[in-house]
Amino acid sequence: MRVLLVNPPQAFYPGSDIPAGNLPLGLLYIAAVLEKNGHEVSILDAFMSDSSIWKSKEKTIIGMPGWRIREEIRKRKPEVVGVSNPFTSQVENAIAVCDIAKGVDPRILTVVGGPHVSAAPAQFLEEAKTADIVVIGEGEYAMLDILDSLARRENLSDVPGIAFRNGTAIVQTSPRPWLKNLDELPYPAYHLVNMEQYLEPKTIEYRSFKDRSISMITSRGCPFNCCFCSVHLHMGKSFRSHSADYVVNHIEHVVNKYRAKTIFFEDDNLTLDMERFEAICDKIIERGMRVNWETPNGVRADCLNPKLLKKMKESGCQSLFFGIESGDQEVLDTVIGKSLDLKKVIEVAKTCKELGLKTGAFYIIGFPGEKRENMLQTIEFALRLRANYDVGMHLFVATPSIGTRLYEQCRQGGYIKENLTSRSFAEARQAQGLPMIETADFTALEVKEIAHEAVKRYRRLSLLIHIKSPAKTFKTAFSQPSIVAKFIKSLYSA
């Protein structure tokens, strides 16, 4: 069958950072599996393949205008259009692509997948009248089964892991088992997109690095139970990973074929299996591969040790991000449910500084169950890590993503201060955020003020550190001037 997979344009609101221009890895994996099984597949990245910026009411849209998407669909004549919807804040753009596809030809089958629709499949189908099918969870073999079912004219009810319309009713099928052997997946179908758009930073003005870089995922699933996280809804709680050989062969492939110089490991639990990741580092070192790599999604500090960190540094690690979330141990244990020892965080931060590894950390404030003093303790912890171990602070406000324990807690407790919309989710994820949660212990405004003051203190501290380390500052300014420009701009906006 002829299949067109679409990454929709993306929207951002006043105060939001411009969405990052990464490879649509989910679509590339689906395309690879479909091609392997004889289907004719093309990909339309309507975000990255067109740099148009246009206004739509209160939001700004980046990417291909609707008329161009319409022309591409007409030209490619797909029987099935698959649409990616990774974030709740972008749901309107996914629906718009379905609308366009049905406008071109009502016979086109529209299939939507991603974290948002996995969390709320029936709700999405009720809202998106032009979407025919929703994929719940992993998409590669669900999409293949949908196509095979259509070709054989079989009942979609027999395809696990989907929801679809049956007249006026919405049918949700039995859950699809999670893919156990990730090594059976072919490499993403890189040949279906213009790789230079993603690899060459000069084509993406808002990137802060200069090397040719590519995103990669080496594992799926998370066995932990953080209240705010939705990864288990679309990737499961069972940790599954590619073998060390598969990962290093994959890295070698993108280095040799696409001249990639930096790998962004986008895993949710990259080092959960420390033996596996040590083997990956060993193989990179043994093969003499000249590649840098980073962990933008964060790693757990309790899944690291000095031996592994040394090998990570030797194998090309340039920076590590930690998912710390709170600097208050009680909040971590009883509110978030992260089961992370802050003493271990400090130990790992110290080792990273000794090894010369750049580090950053993610923090979140504004959870139900927190009080002002808990939030302030998180800020103080973050500032101490910055002052003592050069760990950057990336502060967010708690966001009740649909399908998470946090969302259910907020819904049942009446803590969500307004109707949930694409805009409210987008604004909640902005730097310093526009909080969506209010409890008897804090208002949304109080959380925003705490976050704003914390960022001001962090910037002042960072400025002092830069003044005390001029050589390091000049090196950064030379190698990554956009980071310095952004930092200077932030000082004036504080």
Language model regions located:
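Radical SAM enzyme core and accessory elements
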Residues: 2-5, 79, 404-410, 415-494
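N-terminal [4Fe-4S]-dependent radical SAM core
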Residues: 3-4, 9-17, 159, 165-215
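Short catalytic helix/loop segments, enriched in acidic residues and glycine
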Residues: 21-34
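Radical SAM [4Fe-4S] cluster-binding motif and immediate context
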Residues: 22, 183, 189-365, 380
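Glycine-rich beta-alpha loop elements in corrinoid/cobalamin-binding modules
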Residues: 33-34, 40-181, 399, 403
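Flexible glycine/acidic-rich beta-alpha junction loops that bind and position SAM and/or redox cofactors
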Residues: 50-52, 118-121, 167, 224, ...
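Proline-aspartate-enriched helix->loop->beta-strand connector
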Residues: 77-81, 260, 387
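Catalytic cores of alpha/beta
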Residues: 121-127, 369-384
